[in-house]
Amino acid sequence: MSDPTEFSPPPPTSTDLPPGWLEVTAMDMDAQGVARKPDGKVVFIDGALPTELVSANTHRKKNNWEQASLTEVHRQSSQRVQPGCPHFGLHAGACGGCKMQHLHVAAQVAVKQRVLEDNLWHLGKVKAETILRPIEGPAWGYRYRARLSVRYVPKKDKVLVGFHERKSRYIADMETCKILPPHVDAMLMPLRALIGSMAARDTCPQIELACGDTVTALVLRHLEPLSPEDKDKLRAFAAVHGVQWWLQPKGPETVHLLDEGGEPLAYGLPDFGITMPFKPTDFTQVNPHINRVLVTRALRLLDARKDERVIDWFCGLGNFTLPIATQAREVLGIEGSEALVARSRENYQSNQAQRQDGSALAATSFVARNLFEMTPEMLIADGASDKWLVDPPREGAFALSKALADIHQARIGAEDAPPLPAGHEGWQPPRRIVYVSCNPATLARDAGLLVHQAGYRCVAAGVVNMFPHTAHVESMAVFERG
């Protein structure tokens, strides 16, 4: 929920509006239209778009803001479009997976760009010197990863499979989902029928979807052991729909194939000749089309050279690490999970062995470390590097940015700076940092540290429309030593 202490909409351009009418002047990071009442109170309006004149029904009031739902549009935005999905909207039971289908895709990107710039300035007091061209891709059928909730409803004797309703714990009664790949969208109703036919229909709370370039995997979470008959039904479904079934009886570590064999899950990064095998519960980007462009753009901005050492922080399976290894002299991938580090090494070794153009990947090593507890001592222990790629989760890279800032503050003799660690004399900070973010607020916080305390400039920033029709803002920023 947005807060007017953090977000202040532009003033309305219309005056003397009829009673109850509101002029929407902005959209917040939750995809709500924002207006002001004549008394100055901010109103967040579900379903309203900038430039529209609307009426709305208030359902929550605070001292200086209200939350409301759109009831009527008196002047429509030129960017309003017909939603592509019948389950999108403000009606009872509407799906909560998307928030912006009523807004033209190009305008969605513009809203996300403004959200990024507003966060950088208001939270970090940072303004990028250059705005990068947005990274865009298909608006529909892009979501190759999804966690679908499952529920058997005894009163209706049917199974629901899909996302939750808007602002609700209930599962939407979905027959279709246009952001899923077409072949998965076509499976929704058959999946409902399959689960409904199983003895375990009321003990299967979730199906996780993971699509590779050629393989589609479905992970069935089941709270009780499956009967042989239920397993046979899964096999029959797999044969008809061309999917792999994985089973999850308990935690993520228990995930296993229903039947061994078959082609492994993998996605390619063809610009670098890299193939990335993965398991269905691994973190991979939701949108493979955008991921390919994102990796190429990030590496172009990083501009690693054959005489340079690069560190990839929060490296995961090596989505950026391995492409960097096609360009740099040496690469170090750092990740918080020992299991992911082991998998990264395997991916590196398999790609090294399968290089078809005769080139070799750079010397690359992987280490596990708690990246949320980084210190200046740990930075220096990892050795000097020319450039960094940083791709943290939503929590951001505060400890990493703070450690870099602490070293800089100590070197310039700032008051209250921590002492310099032993061995710092030969250590130099990276000349360039490319930061890929899935949360503009934590990016802005970290950018503030890098720019105001660590001696960097924010030379470029821009959005990546990884999740069309949602309010999620993916972005990237480039920092260079001042």
Curated annotation (Swiss-Prot):
Catalyzes the formation of 5-methyl-uridine at position 1939 (m5U1939) in 23S rRNA. This is 23S rRNA (uracil(1939)-C(5))-methyltransferase RlmD. Its EC number is 2.1.1.190. The gene is rlmD. S-adenosyl-L-methionine binds at Q285, F314, N319, E335, N370, D391. The active site is at C438. HAMAP family: 23SrRNA_methyltr_RlmD (MF_01010). Keywords: 4Fe-4S, Iron, Iron-sulfur, Metal-binding, Methyltransferase, rRNA processing, S-adenosyl-L-methionine, Transferase. One of its GO terms (biological process) is rRNA base methylation. It catalyses: uridine(1939) in 23S rRNA + S-adenosyl-L-methionine = 5-methyluridine(1939) in 23S rRNA + S-adenosyl-L-homocysteine + H(+). [4Fe-4S] cluster binds at C85, C95, C98, C177. It comes from Acidovorax sp. (strain JS42). It comes from the Bacteria. GO terms for molecular function: 4 iron, 4 sulfur cluster binding; iron ion binding; RNA binding; rRNA (uridine-C5-)-methyltransferase activity.
